[in-house]
Curated annotation (Swiss-Prot):
Coiled coil: none annotated. It catalyses: a 1,2-diacyl-sn-glycero-3-phospho-(1D-myo-inositol)(in) = a 1,2-diacyl-sn-glycero-3-phospho-(1D-myo-inositol)(out). Its cofactor is heme b. This is Phosphatidylinositol transfer protein SFH5. It comes from Candida albicans (strain SC5314 / ATCC MYA-2876) (Yeast). Heme binds at Y134, R165, H190, Y192, K226. The lineage of its organism: Eukaryota, Fungi, Dikarya, Ascomycota, Saccharomycotina.
Amino acid sequence: MSSSIEEVKATIKSVKLTDSQAEKLSKLIDSLPKILSGLDNPEYDEIFGYRINTKDKPYVDESIRNEILLKFLAADDYNLELSEKRLIDSLNWRNEFQPLSAAFEETFDKELNELGVITNFPNSNLKITTWNLYGNLKNPKKIFEKFGANNKVSKLPGSQFLRWRVGLMEKSLQLIDFTSTTDNRIAQVHDYNNVSMFKIDPGMKKATKEIITIFGANYPELLSTKFFINVPLIMGWVFTFFKTIRVITEATLKKFQVLNHGNLSESFNPDELPKVYGGKVEKSLFDIDVSDDIKLSEYGEVILKKVGDEEINHINDDVE
C-alpha cells in the first residue's frame, strides 16, 4: 500500500516538508521492498540500529525509519534515483563492514581509548559530540595495520583505526533523537593539540581520506558542526587536503570551523565543558566520556545476534 503525502508528513517531526519533498519521501518508502530485494543480502535491513523495512514488519519504528530515509533524500537534494542508489550502497556496505559489531562487540588497541570520547551535554546547543584527540596517537603504524589477532575480526574489512572510528560514530548515533528539530545530528571536535605536521603518519592521511569517503556516503545529514581546534598555522595543508581530494561537499565544508586555539565556550555551555576547552568543569574529557554507557537499540541487538548465529552456522558448515 502506498504512503500518502499527508501520512508521510505526519511522521516527520525534524523539519516541515513541502508537498514535493513529502512526495519524494513517499516514493522512497514505497520502493523499500524493491530496494531490499536487490541487496547483496536482502535480509540486512538495518541502518544506525533501526529497521528500514515496511511498517508491517516487527521492530519498524515508522517515524524514525522515515527520518533516516529523509536524510538519505536530503543528502542528494531529493533526487530519488541518487537517493535509492545511496541507500542500496549503504545497506550493502553495512552488511559487509558490520559497523554495529565495530561499535558494540569488538575490542581495539588500548591506545585508541585515549584517542576518542563521546560527550552528552544536555544543556548545550550541541548535545552529542564525538571528540578526536590526535595528539594522543603514539603508535600510528600499529593503529593502521589490519586486524590479525582475533579470528572473527580479521574477516571484517578495515584497519583498527577505521573500525574503531566507525564504531565511535555508530555509538554516538544511539544518543540522538532523529525526530527532534534540534538534536537529530551530532557535532565533532578534532583536537590537534601536540600534533606536529612532521609526525603525521602516511597511514593517517590514507585513513583520513577513507573515513571521509565512508562517512560522506553512509552517514548523510548527521553532522551539525565540525570543529578543528588547536590547529597550528603550519598545518594549513590539512584543510587544503580536504578540498583537493574532493570527497567533501561544499555544504559539509561550510560546517567546518577551524581554530588555532581550544576555547569552545562560545559553542558549548561552559557549565558542562572542561576547563581545558574554556569551560568551568574541573574534570577531563575522559571523566565525562559516556561511550561505555551507551546501549544499542533493540533491533540493533537483533541484527548482531542474527549475524553471530549466521557466522556460527558457517563455521559449523566448514567443520563438517
